[in-house]
């Protein structure tokens, strides 16, 4: 199962997210749930890097399917929009394939 956690500060502003695990929907190379989640997460990070003037840190473990993205400061309008867009896509995958394959959590830090 993939567990995505979106980190927020006490004001509800997004400050990062992590994605851990594999969906287990199908075998490697055929797992469309894993591919969809990966595409959304990586596209969000790449979009923030290319279109937003923010500092961030990324830690990734390709073998384990783990990635953690943390902003240096709470999300501004553009980076928050991109993170919210990723969340919308992840909720769509969760609705279509269920909680057996993806869990989306929000955590105040």
For each predicted feature, which ranges?
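N-terminal intrinsically disordered, cationic/polar leader segments
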Residues: 1-32, 41-42, 47-109
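A short mixed-secondary-structure module that forms the rim of ligand-binding clefts
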Residues: 35
């Amino acid at each position: 199962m993939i567990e995505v956690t979106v980190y927020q500060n006490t004001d509800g502003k997004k400050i990062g997210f992590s994605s851990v695990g594999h969906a287990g929907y199908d075998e490697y190379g055929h797992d469309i749930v894993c591919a969809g989640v990966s595409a959304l997460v990586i596209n969000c990070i790449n979009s923030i890097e290319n279109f937003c003037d923010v500092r961030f840190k990324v830690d990734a473990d390709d073998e384990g399917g783990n990635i953690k993205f943390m902003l240096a400061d709470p999300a501004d309008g553009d980076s928050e929009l991109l993170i919210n867009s990723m969340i919308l896509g992840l909720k769509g995958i969760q609705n279509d394939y269920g909680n057996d394959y993806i869990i989306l959590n929000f955590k105040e830090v």
